[in-house]
């Protein structure tokens, strides 16, 4: 538009405003407003220096002359403009004294007369410059910024600070996509400015500024910064409504039409902010236009829709309630369309997120978006969803379409389904690009049930509890309680987790309680009111009471069904859970029909390879159920305190069904269990059942059938899981053990021997089986066959298993024959010791030596004991030497033990060598060989630390006091110092270690009580801490008994010879802690 035409329009507007002001009534406030308004206009028409002498002060005449001489020199114009800004514009000028505070606030930056003059001077110089340079962008930009400062106010921190803020925001946020709207909701645009001209008082200046922007855009229509600056003016809170509504919307549209598409998002950023501040239908239409270009901000648009919908739900005043019906209907229709539009948009976003074509700017998952849609549906059920009858018609129509036309898309709505009171619509057009369920402008309501089933339950099975309760809540909000109940029941029957079940059940129970409470309150209120028609009232009340009784009964049944419903959930989650099936049987109590049905269903559904442990127990319990005549028989059998006669009476009263039980066992033995032992347990329990009912022959036939091998047994391994358990069952030791026990109890000797021989043939017999077989033959007087079984056993097994067999074998052989077959016994002992490990030699050697002592030669016994000192392990060698010495002393005398002591000292470890030296020295002293004893003490001293092994040094000290001289005593002290230097270590560390060990041993002795009464207590100096520590360590380290009976080591012996034990007990006294060895003689 040309400038002259705009000036004429502005003058017309000014005259009209003046006429309105003149026609208004006079008042103090209006007088103040009129006084302020009279100051305007300042810039229209443009200030002319020829008509206003104040525009050019005397100091600026030289600059004016420079412009006259060089009118085309832009630098001269720029210098003059900078001079006027620096000399006239003040950032925060004080207002005029004649103005009140209120008037100064209305005028803002123009409250000072100097600033009004500065505005006129700036306008004059810029307009004259633009007449020379109408297309210069920098000139227009500076002019608009300076003019805007007088109208909009000063930016916070000044223009430089605002420029920095804009640059920083541009770096942090991109002008596209989800970050398009970066301002906080309800943010005031005016907070970025300080002050500003009131839109009513300074209407002329606001209009003049808008006209200036229009002129700039007429000359520079493609400059985006000019457009953005102009559009930002409409967001200012003091912008006049005449500019900030229709004019602003049209200006935004012109900007979008003028600027290229690459700059549109920068315009939309301001446009959408302006639309949100305007609100109403304008906001919705602007947002819809933008979402066609960029749907990424759909969530923001949905929040705007819901905010407007909630604003319409606010309580209205009495006057608004009295409006005509047409207007209220129109309002409800508009609000309903907003809720429906928001619902369809959210549904579309959720589906897009599920397909992976949409990512929420707020980081919401597809399920969160779907739950938001569900919550919106719960909040506005009448406006969004179909009625139950309409949903049924929808389903029928979908089925008809599928059968007639082959259509599989169940989401298409039939043409007869529409909102209440609307005309029929077509199902969908073939050319339509949007689905009716996600087309926001389509008024067709949604089939909520079908959507939740297809988009929710089928895709978010782990959140089914929330979805089912949401659907039920939707029907409750619509008043469809029966449909809600069916929904709860359907949810309970389909969920697979206890969490979802609990969520649904709690909501179901709470809803039932609320409905019952409401009906009871309603009946109570009706009982207090007096009605005219008593008969109708009575009939209505009876119907309501009947309905209340029905609902209360349903609620009680629901509470009673809860354990079964929880069990249903657990079985749906894992139908192979055997324990849950057992719990289900227990829940049915004495309902035999349900119990049988449950057992059969469990057997049918459980996969043996995936079943939890004890799947076989399910068959056993089922068989026992039939065996004892159902749940009543089982309950009587499990009752406590029942006598034998009472049990017989109960057995007579409740007859079992053995044929059905046998059928269950027949079914069980065909199941491919994971473990062979489970199948073996089935066979064993089957035989046990036959035994309980005195069917002994049937029991033996059952076990013989169970161990029957397959035709081809080659290559079958018991632990080969690739083969079915039925194929590997014939190698089950558990099954054979039960079979052989059954034969021993009910069969004859020959049949039992055949079973044992079959086990040995299959090489599945254990050492215990060998011993049991031999014991069975021995009990039946087959002694030699028993010994043959032992021989076969030691050939089958190696050590350490063979040790147990040898131990029992040798004990029984010696007990049977004694010295009658001595050479054979010797051969057996030599055979046992041939490959025996060192740790198992001691019991066999002691038994061998005892045999020679009792039935053979003492000399051979001594050789055996001497051989044992070399054959046994290091841990047993000391005890073996002590035993050997005791036997040698008792047989040949004390002097004969000297070579044994010498060999012991050479072969034993250092710690045991010192102990053996003490014994050797005591022996020599007993024989009167004092010098030999002293030499032995000196030899043993090198192994004894004086700090820790004080017993040795005390004994040597006492020995020297009693038998030595001053020289020998000094020699003993010299050796002690030498040894102490040899063991030179940290004394404090040793003391701490010894003290800790002593405290630990003392605590153990305190727990043992009086059992440690044999420990000797030495006299200890109470003032010496080291002595107390050593005494405690010495007490804790008390020596054990010197001799070990052979029977104590033979742990696997089935029966031990008491003679060996007696000898061992007698021998334990020999070589003990006694100083006197007269007991050896």
Swiss-Prot record:
Compositionally biased intervals (Acidic residues): 311-326, 526-540, 1070-1081
Domain of life: Eukaryota
Disordered: region residues: 1-27, 308-337, 526-546, 1001-1022, 1047-1081
HAT repeats: 54-86, 117-149, 204-236, 243-277, 444-477, 479-514, 656-692, 711-745, 747-779, 781-815, 820-854, 856-887, 892-926, 928-962
The encoding gene: SYF1
Keyword annotations of the record: mRNA processing, mRNA splicing, Nucleus, Repeat, Spliceosome
InterPro entries: HAT, HAT_Syf1-like_N, HAT_Syf1_central, HAT_Syf1_CNRKL1_C, Syf1-like, TPR-like_helical_dom_sf
Compartments, as annotated in UniProt: Nucleus
GO biological process: generation of catalytic spliceosome for first transesterification step; mRNA splicing, via spliceosome
Function: Involved in pre-mRNA splicing and cell cycle progression.
A GO-annotated cellular component: post-mRNA release spliceosomal complex
UniProt-recorded name of the protein: Pre-mRNA-splicing factor SYF1
PANTHER family: PRE-MRNA SPLICING FACTOR (PTHR11246), PRE-MRNA-SPLICING FACTOR SYF1 (PTHR11246:SF5)
């Amino acid at each position: 538009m040309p400038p002259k035409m705009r000036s004429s329009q502005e003058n017309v507007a000014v005259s009209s405003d003046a006429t309105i002001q003149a026609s208004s009534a006079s008042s103090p406030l209006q007088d103040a407003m009129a006084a302020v308004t009279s100051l305007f206009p300042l810039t229209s028409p443009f200030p002319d220096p020829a008509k206003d002498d104040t525009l050019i002060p005397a100091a600026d005449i030289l600059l004016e002359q420079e412009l006259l001489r060089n009118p085309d020199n832009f630098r001269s114009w720029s210098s003059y403009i900078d001079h006027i800004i620096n000399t006239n514009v003040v950032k925060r000028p004080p207002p005029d004294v004649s103005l009140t505070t209120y008037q100064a606030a209305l005028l803002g930056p123009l409250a000072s007369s100097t600033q009004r003059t500065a505005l006129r001077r700036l306008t004059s110089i810029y307009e004259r410059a633009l007449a020379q340079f109408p297309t210069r962008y920098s000139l227009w930009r500076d002019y608009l910024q300076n003019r805007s400062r007088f109208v909009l106010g000063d930016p916070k921190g000044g223009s430089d600070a605002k420029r920095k803020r804009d640059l920083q925001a541009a770096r942090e946020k991109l002008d596209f996509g989800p970050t398009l709207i970066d301002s906080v909701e309800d943010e005031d645009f005016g907070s970025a400015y300080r002050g500003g001209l009131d839109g009513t008082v300074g209407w002329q200046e606001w209009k003049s500024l808008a006209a200036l922007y229009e002129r700039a855009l007429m000359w520079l229509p493609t400059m985006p910064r000019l457009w953005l600056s102009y559009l930002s003016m409409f967001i200012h809170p003091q912008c006049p409504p005449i500019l900030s509504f229709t004019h602003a919307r049209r200006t935004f549209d012109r900007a979008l039409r003028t600027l290229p598409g690459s700059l549109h998002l920068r315009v939309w950023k301001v446009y959408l902010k302006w639309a949100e501040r305007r609100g109403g239908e304008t906001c919705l239409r602007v947002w819809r236009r933008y979402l066609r270009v960029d749907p990424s901000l759909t969530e923001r648009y949905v929040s705007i829709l819901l905010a407007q919908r909630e604003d319409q739900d606010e309580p209205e005043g009495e006057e608004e309630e009295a409006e005509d019906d047409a207007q209220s209907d129109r309002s409800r229709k508009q609000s309903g369309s907003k809720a429906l539009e928001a619902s369809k948009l959210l549904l579309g976003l959720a589906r897009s997120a599920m397909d992976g074509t949409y990512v929420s700017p707020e980081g919401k998952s597809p399920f969160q978006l779907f739950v938001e849609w569900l919550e919106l549906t719960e909040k506005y059920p009448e406006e969004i969803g179909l009625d139950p009858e309409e949903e049924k018609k929808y389903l029928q129509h979908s089925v008809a379409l599928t059968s007639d036309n082959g259509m599989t898309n169940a989401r298409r709505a039939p043409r007869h389904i529409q909102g209440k009171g609307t005309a029929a619509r077509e199902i969908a057009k073939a050319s339509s690009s949007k689905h009716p369920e996600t087309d926001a402008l389509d008024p067709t309501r949604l089939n909520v049930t079908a959507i939740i089933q297809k988009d929710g339950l089928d895709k978010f099975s782990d959140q089914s509890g929330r979805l089912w309760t949401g659907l039920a809540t939707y029907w409750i909000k619509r008043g469809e309680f029966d449909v809600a109940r069916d929904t709860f029941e359907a949810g309970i029957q389909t969920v697979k987790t206890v969490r979802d079940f609990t969520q649904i059940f709690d909501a179901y129970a709470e809803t039932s309680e609320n409905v019952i409470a409401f009906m009871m309150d309603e009946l109570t209120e009706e009982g207090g009111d007096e009605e005219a028609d008593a008969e109708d009232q009575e009939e209505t009340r009876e119907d309501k009471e009947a309905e209340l009784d029905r609902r209360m009964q349903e609620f009680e049944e629901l509470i009673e069904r809860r354990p079964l419903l929880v069990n249903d959930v657990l079985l749906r989650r894992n139908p192979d859970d055997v324990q849950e099936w057992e719990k289900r049987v227990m829940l049915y109590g004495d309902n035999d029909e349900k119990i049988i049905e449950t057992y059969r269903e469990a057997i049918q559904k459980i996969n043996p390879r995936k079943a939890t442990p004890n799947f076989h127990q399910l068959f056993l319990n089922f068989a026992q159920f039939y065996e004892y005549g159902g749940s009543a028989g089982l309950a009587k059998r499990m009752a406590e305190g029942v006598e034998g006669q009472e049990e017989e009476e109960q057995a007579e009263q409740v007859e079992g069904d053995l044929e059905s039980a046998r059928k269950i066992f027949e079914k069980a033995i065909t199941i491919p269990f994971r473990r062979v032992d489970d199948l073996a347990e089935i066979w064993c329990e089957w035989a046990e059942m036959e035994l309980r009912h005195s069917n002994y022959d049937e029991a033996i036939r059952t076990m013989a059938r169970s161990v029957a091998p397959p035709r081809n047994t080659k290559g079958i391994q018991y632990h080969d899981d690739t083969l079915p358990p039925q194929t590997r069952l014939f190698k089950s030791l558990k099954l054979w053990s039960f079979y052989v026990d059954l034969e021993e109890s009910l069969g004859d000797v020959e049949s039992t021997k055949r079973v044992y021989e079959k086990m040995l043939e299959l090489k599945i017999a254990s050492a215990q089986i060998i011993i049991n077989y031999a014991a069975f033959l021995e009990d039946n007087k087959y002694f030699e066959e028993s010994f043959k079984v032992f021989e076969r056993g030691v050939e089958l097994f190696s050590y350490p298993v063979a040790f147990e067999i040898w131990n029992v074998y040798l004990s029984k052989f010696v007990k049977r024959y004694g010295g009658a077959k001595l050479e054979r016994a010797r051969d057996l002992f030599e055979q046992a010791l041939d490959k025996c490990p060192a740790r198992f030699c001691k019991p066999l050697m002691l038994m061998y030596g005892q045999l020679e002592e009792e039935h053979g030669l003492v000399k051979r016994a001594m050789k055996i004991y001497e051989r044992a000192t070399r054959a046994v392990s290091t841990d047993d060698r000391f005890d073996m030497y002590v035993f050997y010495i005791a036997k040698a002393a008792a047989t040949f005398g004390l002097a004969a033990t000297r070579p044994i002591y010498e060999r012991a000292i050479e072969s034993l470890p250092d710690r045991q060598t010192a102990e053996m030296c003490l014994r050797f020295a005591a022996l020599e002293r007993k024989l009167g060989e004092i010098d030999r004893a002293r030499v032995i003490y000196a030899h043993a001293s090198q192994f004894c630390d004086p700090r820790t092994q004080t017993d040795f040094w005390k004994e040597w000290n006492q020995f020297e006091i009693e038998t030595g001289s001053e020289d020998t005593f000094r020699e003993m002290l010299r050796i002690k110092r030498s040894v102490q230097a040899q063991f030179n270590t940290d004394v404090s560390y040793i003391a701490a270690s010894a003290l800790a060990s002593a405290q630990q041993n003392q605590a153990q002795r305190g727990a043992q009580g009086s059992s440690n009464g044999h420990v000797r207590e030495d006299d200890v100096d109470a003032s010496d801490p080291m002595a107390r520590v050593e005494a405690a360590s010495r007490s804790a380290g008390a020596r054990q008994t010197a001799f070990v009976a052979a029977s104590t080591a033979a742990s696997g012996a089935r029966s031990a010879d008491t003679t060996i034990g007696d000898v061992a007990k007698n021998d334990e006294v020999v070589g003990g802690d006694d100083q006197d060895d007269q007991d050896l003689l």
